Amino acid sequence: MTVASHKETLGFQTEVKQLLNLMIHALYSNKEIFLRELISNGADAADKLRFEALTDDALYEDDSALHIRLSYDKDKRTLTIADNGIGMGRQEVVENIGTIAKSGTRAFLESLSGDQAKDARLIGQFGVGFYSAFIVADKVVLETRRAGFGPEHGVRWESGGAGDYTIETIEKATRGTVVTLHLREGEDEFLDGWRLRHIVTRYSDHIDLPIEIKREIGDEEKSEENGEEWEQINKATALWTLPKNDIKEEEYQAFYKHVAHDFEDPLAWTHNRVEGKLEYTSLLFIPPRAPFDLWERDRTQGIKLYVQRVFIMDDTEQLMPRYLRFVRGVVDSNDLPLNISREILQNNRVIDSIRAGSVKKILGLLEDMAKHEAKKYQSFWKEFGQVMKEGVGEDSGNREQIARLLRFASTHHDTAEQTVSLADYLSRMKEGQDKIYYITADSFPAAKSSPHLEVFRKKGIEVLLLSDRVDEWLVASLPEFEGKSLQSVTKGELDLGHLEDEQEKQQQKEVEEDFQNLVERVKNNLGDKVKEVRVTHRLTDSPVCLVVEQHDMSGYLERLLKEAGQQAPHIQPILELNPAHPIIARLKGEESEENFGDWAHLLFEQALLAEGGRLEEPALFVKRLNSLLLAMAD
């Protein structure tokens, strides 16, 4: 079969067309990053070749000096980026360039807002890679051959970045990938050797293989002196292997942008070298913003694993727990075998030790930030707070340290901003208070306006206002903090302990006896809708509220589980009556059993709505309400 018969024209995946169009406009103000992305691809290809060559040295094809080379032609207006890494076969080209085989693609596209600055950050997080070439080029030609394939298995891919591309089989003598950009009008700056040198130095100086540029005619004398046609323009040293004192802040920031495909500087980082029984180096970064796919369960992790400076694998989930899945960086170990697999990683003492040490470093970094850079920590919490809350249940060994990092909204500020630490709460506890009080709800306004808070507000007792979906699991995993138990204000009988005097307790007992008959009448009318009816002193303004037993599932958690499609037992609530409320006083004197029944059901349904619950029969609720309104009007 001839080479020509292998040529075909294929259409881009719909998402690719959308991404190309959005990217060209959103990233144009930061267009030089295309070179960083294409160089990064070349570096990844070299890493993959090194790894595969560990078990098959023949893949080097007698050329183990890996590099990336830049060249340009001012007459043809082309810029070429070439590497001698692993290369690609025909099917790999189709899969890697014609489609986006990435979960969350649709969610990503939907999250784009039209705001160029915001969209640029999101596109960077998504990883534009090869597609960034179309920011400055109106035609891109890629020629590649996979290491180990014969010269006749070369592939040429070509596209103008519109709806389709052509792909054909070609002869290619050398392995690796060559990307040639036919630059758009007005992009002549990328045909300037000094401009290219500047971009490489700024974005890719840390890439640990040589990036070379073809000497210009003006450099002819230098070329004749040393006999070299190519000039290396980067340091080509793995940044994490250098002493911390030798690395500039700008170099750390540039390296972060490389590993995270981000446009912004990292929020913080920690660089550590461990020596002794176990030897490894870690360079870990906290991003400034949460990625769009933070809540995708199958999203990739952000840690690259190296063994003795040889890249082994991306997305090493064993190196960082899920609640720290936003961390980016590298880990380089001297104690793992070069041929380690993902299966071996799952039960490996070295990996377990590296993971434990890395987690300690990240938590320590965050603790230091919270203590000394409160504003920066608040920025971190706004982006990653909900994920950090998962750690309380996932990481029992570090639970206390994570608990110190938690931030909540509370009645102290009465704003939705989560700024209150548990230590802050303890420092403001009333004399005689022995519990940390909280309420969970499906929104901040619902938590803030809950009738369960009325007596706490009256007595000036602070209550944490929890409205994140993860909060129910958080409090279930955190029974106490520094000796003080956490207590839901919607569970069990209210016992304020030493915060109430004996006279108050005696008055409450007398009121309960006085309302015993009313309590029994309400229970008889409501039947199985409630587990119990009782008088309460937790209310000051509302007539009723619903609570559950101390160890029962809250109504909010029950709703969360059902929304997630999980089975949840129905918990019978307890209806509590406020004896000081005029409606309850009127109900006490109601002689008509029909009206009494309507009032009892209406109050129960009102309490259910107040805590975010749903009515089983909304039409019946409206009918009762209208009936009672008419009776009152008469």
Curated annotation (Swiss-Prot):
In this entry, which stretches build a coiled coil?
Answer: none
> Which Pfam families does the UniProt record give?
HATPase_c_3 (PF13589), HSP90 (PF00183)
**Subcellular compartments:** Cytoplasm
Region C, annotated ranges? 560-634
Q: Which UniProt keywords apply?
A: ATP-binding, Chaperone, Cytoplasm, Nucleotide-binding, Stress response
User: InterPro entries attached here?
Assistant: HATPase_C_sf, Heat_shock_protein_90_CS, HSP90_C, Hsp90_fam, Hsp90_N, Ribosomal_Su5_D2-typ_SF
Q: Where is this region: A?
A: 1-342
Question: What Gene Ontology terms describe where this protein resides (cellular component)?
Answer: cytoplasm
Primary localisation category: cytoplasm
Q: Which GO terms describe its molecular function?
A: ATP binding; ATP hydrolysis activity; ATP-dependent protein folding chaperone; unfolded protein binding
Identify the stretch(es) annotated as B.
Answer: 343-559
**Alphabetical list of NCBIfam families matching this protein:** PRK05218.1
Query: Which family does the entry's similarity section mention?
Result: Belongs to the heat shock protein 90 family.
Full protein name: Chaperone protein HtpG
Q: What is the species listed in this Swiss-Prot or TrEMBL entry?
A: Nitrosococcus oceani (strain ATCC 19707 / BCRC 17464 / JCM 30415 / NCIMB 11848 / C-107)
